[in-house]
A protein has these predicted regions:
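A short, N-terminal "cap"/entry segment at the start of jelly-roll beta-barrel domains
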Residues: 1-33, 119-155
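Conserved hydrophobic/aromatic beta-strand scaffold that supports enzyme active sites
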Residues: 23-25, 36-38, 57, 83-85, ...
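Conserved short histidine dyad/triad with adjacent acidic residue
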Residues: 25, 33-51, 87-90
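Short acidic-glycine-tyrosine-enriched beta hairpin
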Residues: 30-31, 71-91
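Short histidine-centered beta-strand/loop micro-motifs
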Residues: 37-39, 47-52, 69-70, 75-76, ...
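Glycine- and acidic-residue-biased ligand/ion/polar-headgroup-sensing regions
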Residues: 43, 52-71
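A short hydrophobic beta-strand segment most commonly corresponding to one strand
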Residues: 84-85, 99-116
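Aromatic- and Lys/Arg-enriched surface recognition patch
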Residues: 91-95, 105
Length: 155
């Protein structure tokens, strides 16, 4: 199988420890509640259990995106080039990379409050990630000049 590498040398990644991944916000549309963000998953590190509260889509740019059920069993593997829309309030899951680092474009749609809830082992909410968190990440990118090469912006 051929390996494709996404050239991310112009991307300034922000580590979000609570989700065990790195992000770079590309654009935010306040009026429509849209957040477009690159998320980078390190190889073979399982993601945190969570549930999406809004509609979203994913496009795998590098590596593969692996999905696990709440019990840890493998649900699905999406290879490079996979585009999949997702519904709000779907099944809780975790996601992460396989043997190669994964870079995925996530487009979250139609929410200006909480967008993702992270769950503990008893399925209780342990952390919320919302529209304001992505806005803060974009503001940090702009303030530090991290967005200038890619032109990230709030609409």
């Amino acid at each position: 199988m051929q390996t494709y590498v996404f050239d991310d040398h112009n991307v300034s990644w922000q580590t979000i420890e609570v989700i065990d991944a790195q992000i770079h916000v590309l654009a935010i549309d306040d009026d429509r509640g849209i957040v477009d963000v690159l998320i980078r998953f390190q190889p073979n590190i399982p993601g945190k259990l969570h549930q999406h509260l809004c509609e979203f889509s994913t496009l795998v740019l590098q590596g593969e995106l692996q999905f696990q059920r709440p019990d840890g069993s493998l649900k699905e593997v999406r290879p490079t080039g996979s585009y999949v829309p997702g519904a709000a309030n779907g099944e809780p899951h975790s996601e992460g990379a396989g043997d190669q680092m994964a870079i995925v474009l996530f487009s979250f749609r139609g929410a200006t409050g909480d967008m993702i809830v992270y769950l503990d082992k008893t399925m209780d909410v342990s952390f919320r990630l919302g529209f304001s968190d992505f806005k803060a990440a974009l503001a940090h990118q702009i303030a530090t000049g991290a967005s200038t090469k890619l032109g990230a912006r709030a609409i």
